[in-house]
UniProtKB/Swiss-Prot annotation:
Ranges where the tr-type G domain occurs: 438-607
Positions annotated to bind GTP: 447-454, 493-497, 547-550
Protein's name according to its UniProt entry: Translation initiation factor IF-2
Subcellular location: Cytoplasm
Region (G5): 583-585
Name of the gene this protein is made from: infB
Length: 939
């Protein structure tokens, strides 16, 4: 049976565990501590006894029925004489402690005393007990008596003695009751009711139990009350208290204190002392009614009221917080939307909505709803029906806006909103013809990898850049300025590797003339075609340089034929493209190439205004130690000076230094000139437009606006999904992924690596790029990689420091560094291949022909075979082939040579074979054994 602990009962009733233990002793329940347990039935009986004072387990105190023995009470006069001096100073204490303790234990115990008193006195008892025992003669004795008995019970005294004392007092009370005392007891009943109510659930106890010193002072009175007979006891009490002036003074003080006693203020919100009985007369109230009151009158209503007050207070606090702390998050809440919906539409609004509405090209769904006067629900519903799932904060593209306008029957005009974010728009005004000056041409060298682009530029500049390139291939855009016949030419060298498509496209965009380098001994290759397409898309003049003509196997005519097939015919063949024969090794044709460039630039009439605010294009950017973010730029118009405030996409700052291609510090650069800029807040994206503005605050404002816009756009893109894309996204989540962190030396290289890695995927594996950045490998990168399972850090032209290596070793993170991009891609491709599930390939091990069959009862069919090829092994996989058709595929259950089990039988020997779960073997069948071999797949 489940048991209940004392502290649980105390918690339920709102009283102390100690009081419950005291009450349990009246029912002969042996409870010692708050952790003591008792069965549920006894617990229910105990709770009922505490609340009502009634119990079927309450036994009459048998030893207390006869009168006390003479020898037990004989010490009373002695104790009285010894302790009498202490009675006077304790009177005030007794009266102050009187109220609550006096009445708490009375009502339950009186039930027991009714059974103990002889029948002749029972006639008087009910009336008396209903109206409470306190009397005029017992004003100073009874509280002390109660305190003493409680103290004795706490210290485990003899229960016999306490019961006898109680009975003696009750008997004395019956004998001395007067009409005045009855009236006094009615006043006292109110105190009893209050004390009883205080013990209910949810009500606090106003006063504690009697203090410790009080019982000591009360002992003389207690012993005096123990007289040999009732008559003697009556005389003793009368002699002590009846004619005493002090007792009358104490009674007067007690009455005065009862009238003036204020209700103590509640210390907790859920506790309140209430006067349940008021000033009602109690003569007509029966004991049963009082007990009903005790059971029914809980303070639930008061607690409810308190809870309501708390809720109101909380609501007030919340409202105050909303007013005081106004944040953009609160503006996006439900309340704001509701207020907007309730706002009545003015006549002006209706007129504007009915006409043509200007809608920005980049607009969120809820903003579209506001501008068109439609609800956001209508907008989302239309797009939902068309298979596009969006939220109210998602951006709408041009197609979605047009569809919505058609579906909702609106006349809208889409305008380009990015003008507000375009810091370059102010610079793109019509240039004043008077301020224009001739500028040098910007020439981009493009072509296939290893066709000699950088070597050609080295020969023009008389440097050795190519020799310093890792693997002999260019992996960054390089910008240089050379002088020919007093005229400057700016060259941009682009990588030829397939991974650097973006760089080549960027180089073609900012250029005036493109030189396509083709090796005369190799011909037109994939990247050559791509470079030609980039140049054609940029609508710039193309000069084709046939390099390596000094080689013995060079065939320029073959290259011209291949170019003509692509639509690039040479001038001598009636085409429009200049083909120049050069050799980067010997210098042959270099001057002719430069002259061709200058002639072409004169035809283009390249001009710019150097007095305007500078506008440049970021060719490459990187993070350099000691300099911070740096960007290689080529100026398109105006003049960029040291100290100018600049902004490039989300990066901003002030030009701290300008470094030319020779490494010298310069003060300014004009149109078509190249330099490295330092002083930016972050590395700008390659291809970003850099402009100079009036001051730093304007630059900062442009950059922050654009950063916020791009972030919102990215978040919006991540939430939008169509039904068709949904299944693809689910499948994407089930792919195995290799988490990588990429760190590169320049922004262009980073883009190239990122783009190449994202292409390395199939239906089973993919690359998950956790983080990609420009700069060295740091400890934070290692910690980030450590937080992801099986993450790898890939460094390109960067190296980790000693502390970073140690940290990576601690966290078990693999750091790989490369200087050649195709080595990086090959390694990643190999890792992805290992992640893919292996391919199972079959390898034939042997063949046997059935010559005879034997059927054995309870065993099966055994085939007598001759091994014709390889060897037959026990337990290996086997196919049964009959007339060229596979009849059964399974395992060999038993392999025997004559009567002995064999592990393997080689070619030319006979053996007996039994198949696992197949007996339909016929003469002439062929057994073909094989094993499955796992082989790693390649991406």
């Amino acid at each position: 049976m489940q048991k209940v602990r004392v502290h649980e009962i105390a918690l339920e009733l709102g009283i102390k565990s100690k009081e419950i233990i005291d009450k349990a002793k009246d029912l002969d329940l042996d409870l010692k501590t708050a952790s003591s347990a008792l069965p549920q039935e006894e617990a229910a009986e105990l709770v009922n006894y505490i609340l009502t004072g009634k119990s079927s387990r309450l036994k009459p105190a048998a030893p207390a029925a006869p009168m006390p023995k003479e020898e037990e009470i004989s010490p009373a006069p002695q104790e009285e004489s010894q302790m009498e001096p202490k009675e006077e100073p304790q009177k005030e204490v007794k009266e102050s402690v009187k109220e609550a303790p006096e009445s708490l234990p009375e009502s339950p115990k009186e039930e027991a005393f009714e059974a103990e008193i002889p029948k002749e006195s029972v006639k008087v008892t009910p009336k008396t007990l209903e109206q409470e025992p306190p009397k005029e003669e017992l004003v100073s004795i009874e509280p002390s008596l109660e305190s003493a008995s409680e103290t004795l019970s706490d210290s485990n005294p003899l229960p016999q003695e306490k019961t006898e004392t109680k009975e003696t007092i009750v008997a004395t009370t019956l004998a001395t009751q007067t009409d005045a005392e009855i009236q006094e007891s009615e006043e006292k009943k109110e105190t009893l009711a209050q004390a009883t109510v205080q013990k209910r659930v949810g009500l606090r106890i106003v006063k504690k139990r009697s203090e410790e010193p009080a019982p000591k002072a009360d002992r003389p009175s207690l012993e005096e009350a123990r007289t040999p007979s009732r008559t003697a006891g009556l005389k003793t009490l009368q002699s002590l208290l009846g004619e005493s002036d002090e007792s009358e003074a104490a009674l007067a003080r007690k009455k005065k204190k009862e009238k003036k006693k204020p209700l103590p203020a509640p210390t907790k919100k859920n506790e309140q002392k209430i006067d349940l009985l008021g000033d009602r007369a109690l003569e007509t109230v029966s004991s049963f009614d009082d007990e009903q009151e005790e059971i029914v009158l809980f303070d639930l209503t008061i607690r409810d009221d308190i809870n309501k007050e708390d809720e109101v207070a909380k609501k007030v606090d919340t409202d105050r917080i909303k007013v005081q702390r106004k944040t953009p998050f609160l503006d996006q809440g439900i309340r704001r939307v509701k207020r907007r919906k309730r706002r009545p539409q003015t006549v002006a609004d209706k007129e504007s909505i009915s006409g043509t509405i200007e809608i920005p090209e980049e607009i969120r769904a809820y903003e579209f709803a506001e501008k068109t006067g439609k609800s956001i629900g209508e907008v989302i519903k239309v797009l939902f029906n068309l298979g596009l799932m969006i939220t109210k904060n998602d951006f709408l593209d041009r197609d979605s806006i047009e569809i919505l306008a058609e579906e909702l029957e609106l006349d809208v005009v889409i305008k380009n909103t990015s003008e507000a974010l375009e810091y370059t728009s102010e610079e793109e005004e019509d240039e004043d013809e008077e301020g224009l000056e001739e500028r040098p041409p910007v020439v981009t060298i493009m072509g296939h990898v290893d066709h000699g682009k950088t070597s050609l530029l080295d020969k023009i500049r008389n440097t050795k850049v190519a020799a310093g390139e890792a693997g002999g291939i260019t992996q960054h855009i390089g910008a240089y300025t050379v002088e020919k016949d007093g005229k400057k030419i700016s060259f941009i060298d682009t990588p030829g590797h397939e991974a650097f498509t973006e760089m080549r496209a960027r180089g073609a965009e900012v250029t005036d003339i493109v030189i396509i380098v083709i090796a005369a001994d190799d011909g037109v290759k994939q990247q050559t075609i791509e470079a030609l397409n980039h140049a054609k898309a940029a609508n710039v003049p193309i000069i084709i340089a046939l390099n390596k003509v000094d080689k013995p196997d060079a065939n320029p005519d073959k290259v011209k034929a291949e170019a003509a097939d692509l639509g690039y015919s040479p001038l001598e063949w009636g085409g429009e493209y200049e083909f120049v024969h050069i050799s980067a090794k010997t210098g042959e044709g270099i001057d002719h190439l430069l002259e061709t460039i200058l002639v072409q630039s004169e035809l283009l009439e390249l001009k710019a205004n150097p007095e305007k605010a500078a506008k440049a294009v970021v060719i490459e950017s990187s993070l350099e130690k000691g300099k911070g973010p740096v960007a290689t730029v080529i100026v398109q118009s105006g003049t960029l000076k040291v100290g100018d405030s600049i902004v490039a996409d989300t990066a901003y700052g002030r030009v701290r230094a300008l470094i030319d291609d020779c490494g010298k510090n310069i003060q300014s650069i004009g149109p078509s000139e190249v330099a490295v800029v330092t002083g930016l807040s972050e590395t700008p994206m390659a291809g970003a437009v850099l402009v100079s503005v009036e001051n730093d605050s304007i630059a900062r404002e442009y950059a922050e606006k654009r950063a916020l816009y791009l972030r919102q756009k990215e978040l919006s893109r991540s939430t939008k999904v169509s039904f068709d894309e949904l299944s693809a996204m689910v499948a994407e989540g089930q792919l195995k992924s290799l988490p990588v962190i990429i760190k590169a030396d320049t922004q262009g290289s980073l883009e190239a690596i990122r783009g190449s890695l994202e292409k390395l995927r199939n239906e089973e594996v993919k690359i998950n790029i956790i983080h990609a950045g420009v700069g060295g490998i740091t400890e934070s990168d290692v910690v980030l990689a450590g937080a992801s399972d099986n993450s790898v850090i890939l460094g390109f032209n960067v190296r980790p420091t000693g502390s970073v290596k140690n940290r990576a070793k601690e966290l078990g993170v693999e750091v790989k560094t490369y200087s050649i991009i195709y080595a990086l891609l090959d390694d990643v491709r190999a890792v992805l291949g290992g992640m893919m599930s292996p391919v199972l390939e079959e390898e034939n091990t042997g063949q046997a022909e059935v010559r005879e069959t034997f059927t054995i009862a309870k065993v099966g069919t055994i085939a007598g075979c001759l091994v014709t090829d390889g060897s037959i092994q026990r337990g290996i996989k086997v196919r049964l082939i009959r007339n060229g058709v596979v009849v059964f595929t399974g395992n060999i259950a038993s392999l025997k040579r004559f009567k002995d089990d064999a592990r393997e039988v080689s070619k030319g020997y006979e053996c007996g074979i039994m198949l696992e779960g197949f007996n339909d073997v016929q003469v002439g069948d062929v057994f073909e054994t094989y094993k499955e071999v796992e082989k790693a797949r390649k991406l």
